[in-house]
């Protein structure tokens, strides 16, 4: 791969977007790619938006990219997909967790949660929507939702030479390694059903 590829990961604080970016970066580095990563935490500790950008290729000169430049966008919450859609290029792939987190204003009834987030993305982009949060709960730990979603997106990375399951096993803490391997496999399987 000579050209640079870019992935935008978006979610709400505490959902694990940064862990996904670390898994990606570790895998690409092991495969010999030049990798750059950036993180924006915002008000993450208060349920605010979190985004991280990962770029990989033969030579990457900077970690940040602009609107319309992401080849892949991973949204750990479906409203975040719509919020950051302008960063995805027209031929890009959106991988979305079909899950809603209600902000304080929505939970209080002051605002309504927007309808049709996934449908809006499907009109404009190739979209893989999986119930990653539900799958994680079925696996016994809702915190592994991020790895479920990573599994759903890994085939879109276009790097079949990388053993992503092994990278997950090497990146996550040992005490949750088996859970995260199951989460990765479940996410990959869910995405294959969407294709």
Please provide the spans of the model-predicted regions.
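Active-site cofactor/cluster-binding pocket
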Residues: 1-195
């Amino acid at each position: 791969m000579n050209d640079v590829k870019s992935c935008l990961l978006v979610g709400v604080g505490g959902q694990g977007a940064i862990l996904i970016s670390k898994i990606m970066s570790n895998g690409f580095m092991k495969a010999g790619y030049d990798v750059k990563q950036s993180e924006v935490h915002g008000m993450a500790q208060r349920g605010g938006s979190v985004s991280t950008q990962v770029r990989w290729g033969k030579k990457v000169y900077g970690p940040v990219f602009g609107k319309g430049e992401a080849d892949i966008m991973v949204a750990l919450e479906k409203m975040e997909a719509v919020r950051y859609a302008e960063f995805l290029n027209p031929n890009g792939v959106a991988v979305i967790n079909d899950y809603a987190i209600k902000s304080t204003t929505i939970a209080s009834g002051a605002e309504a949660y927007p309808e049709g987030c996934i449908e809006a993305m499907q009109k404009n982009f190739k979209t893989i929507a999986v119930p990653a949060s539900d799958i994680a709960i079925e696996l016994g730990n809702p915190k592994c939702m991020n790895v479920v979603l990573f599994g759903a997106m890994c085939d879109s990375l276009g790097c079949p030479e990388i053993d992503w399951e092994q990278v997950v096993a090497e990146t996550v803490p040992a005490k949750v390694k088996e859970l995260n391997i199951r989460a990765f496999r479940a996410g990959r399987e869910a995405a294959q059903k969407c294709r």
